[in-house]
A protein has these predicted regions:
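An acidic-aromatic substrate-binding cleft motif
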Residues: 272, 276-369, 373, 377, ...
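Carbohydrate-binding surface patches
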Residues: 628-671, 713-716
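Conserved, mostly hydrophobic/aromatic
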Residues: 150, 374, 498, 586, ...
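C-terminal beta-strand-rich structural cap/linker in extracellular carbohydrate-active enzymes
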Residues: 694-731
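Glycan-recognition and catalytic regions of carbohydrate-active enzymes
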Residues: 124, 596-645, 649, 680-686
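Aromatic- and carboxylate-enriched substrate-binding clefts and catalytic-loop regions
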Residues: 385-572, 576
């Protein structure tokens, strides 16, 4: 149900008006104050339970100076832009419109079946007297946080304009503890650093680790979503929502005054955005609570996005899948078919005359082996990477015509393999690695999607490894952000679901476009084969990267010493086996991969049972215990079955947690199966040590579970039946 009441205080001609406005959250705990500071500078503050969260912070944008106007048919003389134009001062207060809304909506898939969208809104219209330009700042205050954006109505004095920089500030109250990755225009694939804000400059050089494409921009620049904790126990998260036709926002820190200022990703010419009024920016968001669990449970980002754009969503389904992938990531096999050709020319290189290397992973026999295992254990799909021609010189050459997305290698029979998979009751998942040659992908996109239609594919994993073509563009600039959505929308025309890797980090657009069922956009499991990730990584990601949407983290590695897969790779997966099981619950995604090799799962089939059983779509989710960088424990109720699944992970420290079961129905008995670290488990020395126990639990049960260093646990819970009468209580 939605109720909106509109109150407008218009500035009458010649009348005086206060330059300060207040907005409260529906529960009254959050308080926003907007004012015009000296010089007509828009400013805001935010308090939580009468404790300051954001100190007075500036707002607005700087525009590129106007260039001489060109007229069609006139002599063309290209002039340089004039001086930058301010849209951050010189304002007077105009109309203030207030409203409130309280409604619920049902996501196509998600952490819960229904989401409440309740907020109070204030839209402040500002007039810049010297230019006659109007700008509206729209604030929405929820019980869990704040969203605001800049809106530019249609007006003669501001129609086409170019953004030089956004001037939004977030002034912190002190030297907070932050969980951050370096600000970068091209990658989020960094390990997180936990430090005080004042230490970011000192720690930045060590935090910037090599990547296939990276452009750090500042010694104190960080990426959103940024999670912080104040000394007085407030958890503060800064991000953005509904990133459409705009550049990704980073944060640049003034580390003397602890003030963050927005920093937009530039284009090849250094400009930040090309706009045409009427238009608006994405929402800037601040989520805040004195309980870390509230940050994880917040739906602020989703609520600030537009409703679903599709009338029919029946074709969009959660997916549990395996892949011909980990063996390539670890170096056991190759994406490429041959080593005989130093360079590939599509349509010219004759692969029938090339000698196979013998290391090509996507061959008919190997793919069938994966299909057999995946089908036997109830998986929906099998990803196959390296199926298409062009991998011999795909990376590092800024090559435009690199893949055509329709031509298979000689040893990949696309028709026969899809028929074989369908006969076993599963589908193949398409792979479109673009090598960041985006123009090439767009010119082939329609043909690529039609090929998927022809052979029965309904999901695609896309990738953007390397520096972007066109040259000079960045992964997170306005042009690329428009491309990512273009790919998702065109996929929807073919009823195809998209899992985008190396794309911009999510901002809740999966609400509007639910066929965007997965993103990577962070350091995923593949880095465990590239030297490893820190154990605390998975206790931070739900507070940061997952704030904007689910992640295709690709968990489920059971053999931690990578040398057992490829003797030449001495990486180690920094997790216990029980930790890997827990990730299917703690790292929410409607797209979940069992990433390891079939032969590894066959060694631990009792533990693999949890991956078979765990659900993908949820009726409700409860965050039971949480502290960023330390631990997370989550309970989720499966949609349609009433079964519960619980997952817990810890950092590099061993810890014991006491689990409540008060979310279970009163008066009922349940059977719980616990997959836990063995007493001698350790992520470095004994990662495969686990125990499995089954027993009865109820609403009043409390259970102590010990997690090893880098460890965790997983629990499946179902209602008890008469056959379970002899089971003892779980201990």
């Amino acid at each position: 149900m939605k109720k909106i009441f509109l109150y407008i205080s218009a500035l009458l001609a010649g009348a005086a008006c206060t330059a300060q406005e207040t907005l409260l959250s529906p529960d009254g705990r959050l308080r926003l104050e907007f004012s015009l500071a000296d010089g007509g500078r828009p400013t805001y503050t935010l308090d939580y339970k009468e404790r300051p969260v954001i100190l007075p912070s500036g707002m607005g944008l700087e525009l590129r100076g106007e260039a001489p106007k060109l007229e069609f048919g006139a002599e063309i003389r290209k002039g340089e832009p004039g001086r930058p134009v301010s849209l951050y001062d010189g304002f007077t207060l105009g109309q203030v419109a207030r409203s409130e809304s309280d409604q619920t909506w049902r996501p196509v898939w998600g952490e819960q079946a229904e989401i409440r969208d309740r907020y109070n809104e204030m839209a402040v219209t500002l007039r810049q007297a010297t230019t006659g330009r109007d700008m509206t700042i729209r604030f929405r205050l929820y019980d869990d946080g704040l969203g605001f954006r800049y809106e530019f109505p249609e007006q003669e004095s501001l129609t086409y304009f170019v953004i030089g920089e956004e001037k939004t500030q977030f002034a912190m109250t002190g030297d907070h503890t932050a969980f951050w990755i370096p600000g970068d225009y091209d990658t989020q694939e960094y390990d997180y650093t936990e430090s005080k804000l004042s230490q970011i400059r000192e720690l930045m050089p060590g935090a910037i680790t090599p990547n296939s494409s990276q452009t750090p921009f500042s010694p104190t620049g960080v990426q959103t979503a940024l999670q912080m904790k104040s000394d007085d126990g407030l958890y503060i998260n800064i991000h953005e929502a509904a990133l459409v036709d705009y550049a990704c926002m980073h944060l640049d820190l003034d580390d003397r005054n602890f003030i963050f200022t927005s920093h937009l990703t530039p284009d090849a010419q250094g400009w930040k955005g090309y706009m045409q009024a009427p238009c608006h920016t994405p929402w800037r968001t601040v989520t805040v609570s004195d309980d870390a669990r509230d940050i994880l449970a917040s739906k602020l980002i989703l609520n600030l996005n537009e409703p679903c754009a599709y009338d029919d969503t029946s074709w969009i389904k959660p997916v549990k899948y395996m892949g011909v992938w980990w063996e390539m990531i670890t170096g056991k096999s190759d994406w490429a078919y041959t080593r005989d050709v130093p360079s590939v020319q599509l349509g010219v290189t004759d692969y029938a005359r090339c000698r196979p290397s013998g290391r090509h992973g996507a061959n008919n026999e190997n793919v069938k082996r994966y299909i057999d295992f995946a089908a036997a254990h109830g998986f929906d799909q099998l990803l196959v990477e390296g199926w298409n021609v062009g991998w011999e010189d795909w990376f590092g050459h800024t090559k435009d015509y690199v893949f055509d997305f329709v031509s298979p290698y000689p040893d990949f029979d696309i028709a026969a393999l899809n028929e074989y998979a369908h006969g076993k009751g599963i589908r193949l998942m398409m792979h479109h690695e673009t090598s960041a040659s985006v123009r090439n992908y767009e010119r082939h996109m329609e043909a690529a999607y039609r090929l998927m239609d022809k052979y029965g594919y309904n999901s695609v994993k896309s990738g953007y490894v390397g520096d972007i073509l066109p040259r000079g563009e960045h992964h997170y600039g306005q042009w690329m952000n428009n491309h990512y959505l273009y790919a998702v929308r065109r996929a929807a025309d073919h009823k195809i679901m998209v899992n985008a890797h190396e794309a911009v980090r999510p901002t809740g657009l999966c609400r509007t476009y639910p066929n965007l069922i997965g993103n990577e956009s962070a350091r995923g499991t593949e880095y465990q084969a590239f030297g490893g990730s820190k154990p605390h990584h998975v206790t931070i990601l739900p507070f940061t990267r997952l704030q904007g949407g689910p992640m295709d983290y690709t968990p489920g590695i059971f053999v931690m010493d990578v040398a057992e897969v490829n003797p030449g790779n001495h990486s180690h997966v920094n997790a216990t086996l029980a930790n890997q099981l827990a990730l299917y619950v703690t790292m929410y995604s409607p797209l979940q991969m069992a990433a390891d090799l079939p032969e590894h799962y066959e060694k631990y089939m009792d533990a693999f049972r949890f991956i078979e059983d765990v659900a993908l779509d949820w009726e409700e989710s409860r965050y039971l215990l949480a502290e960023p960088g330390d631990y997370i424990v989550v309970a989720r109720k499966a949609k349609g079955t009433g079964e519960w699944f619980v997952g817990g992970v810890t950092d590099e420290n061993r810890r014991t947690v006491t689990l409540p079961f008060d979310y279970l129905d009163p008066g009922k008995e349940y059977v719980a199966t616990l997959y836990a670290d063995a007493p001698d488990a350790d992520y470095q020395t004994n990662p495969q040590a686990y125990v499995i126990r089954t027993g009865k639990v109820g609403q009043r049960t409390e259970l102590d579970v010990e997690m090893a260093r880098g460890g965790g646990f997983a629990i499946s819970i179902r209602e008890a039946t008469d056959a379970d009468r002899k089971l003892r209580r779980l201990k």
